[in-house]
Amino acid sequence: MAKKDYYQILGIPKSAEEREIKKAYKRLAMKYHPDRNQGDKNAENKFKEIKEAYEILINEEKRTAYDQYGHAAFENGYNQNNTYSTFTSSTDFGDIFGDVFGDIFGGSRNQRVKKGADLCYNMEISLEEAVKGTTKEIRIPTFQKCKTCYGMGTSTGTKPNGCSTCHGKGQIHIRKGFFTVQQSCPTCNGIGTVIKNPCRMCRGQGRIKTNKTLSVKIPPGIDTNDKIRLSKEGEAGTNGAQPGDLYVQMKVNKHPIFEREENNLYCEVPINFTMAALGGEIEVPTLDGRVNLKIPSETQSGKLFRIRGKGVKSVQSRSRGDLLCRVVVETPVNLNEKQKYLLSELGNSFNGFRGDKNSPRSKRFFDGVKRFFDDLTK
């Protein structure tokens, strides 16, 4: 009796992609699976056809051969015995439905290798270090690959043995009602191998807990909440898997003089009212040393003066921010009698506190107050 066309069995066109093949197989396999049709010989035979068609069409080489030669390409080589009962092929029912039912029934995918965990380290630095860049040494607790067994977990001269429970696959198949699902092997914990002669140093784990010292290069311009990634400096992986990464989380401590806003620095510069009125020159601090700042006459409190290039260097470019100095005019305190007299005379020379010429802002303020109360009495 001639075999049916594999494409017709799955109900797909010859141009079907891998995703369409899998989708059709899932739908038909669920419908005709023997666990759902116990005692139904027709369903059993139908499932065998579906399984056979899927295994040919999902394999690129077999599909190409089938498209060229038809069923004759497999008459001498393809074995379809025990199609559904043993589920030993690479395309078994558990593989197809594991992604759907694995979470429900506690199933687990291959756990043979597992990348090491990423680590995070919180680092505090000063503003000076953030602006200029620096190198810091840190010490972190982590898991490192065992240097005695090189991560294998076995004693010298031995190697892991294949697990007799799962035959090295790392998974076993458990019947759950109508379904047979994959689960991680309880004997080898999904690894596929067991260690009969474990390494004495790591006790078969392949890695040991230790403290690791690292040198971290901090670039100029780093800021709070920035992260520095150190590739493969996290925990060692299991069974030869690559290690994780280390992320250094930055925090720049507050400075007693400067405040940072992006790449600019701000500071307050107190001056006496004489300098504010007459002008002068004052030394101001920068992170590179002292510089002279010229104060023009008639400077008002709160005025900002910009010193270019004395801020923070950008991490992304070579440009550097500015230093902005906010002038604060101080009111003199602890005056002696002579100073009080001189200030009184100075105030009288201004024609009181509302002098039009010497205190224009005061005049505007008090004129506004007068208009406000005049409007209330109308």
Swiss-Prot record:
Protein name: Chaperone protein DnaJ
UniProt function note: Participates actively in the response to hyperosmotic and heat shock by preventing the aggregation of stress-denatured proteins and by disaggregating proteins, also in an autonomous, DnaK-independent fashion. Unfolded proteins bind initially to DnaJ; upon interaction with the DnaJ-bound protein, DnaK hydrolyzes its bound ATP, resulting in the formation of a stable complex. GrpE releases ADP from DnaK; ATP binding to DnaK triggers the release of the substrate protein, thus completing the reaction cycle.
Residue intervals of every CR-type zinc finger in the record: 133-211
Ranges of residues in domain J: 5-70
Binding sites annotated in the UniProt record for Zn(2+) 1: C146, C149, C199, C202
Taxonomic lineage: Bacteria, Pseudomonadati, Pseudomonadota, Gammaproteobacteria, Enterobacterales
HAMAP family reported for this sequence: DnaJ
CDD domains: DnaJ, DnaJ_C, DnaJ_zf
Native source species: Buchnera aphidicola subsp. Schizaphis graminum (strain Sg)
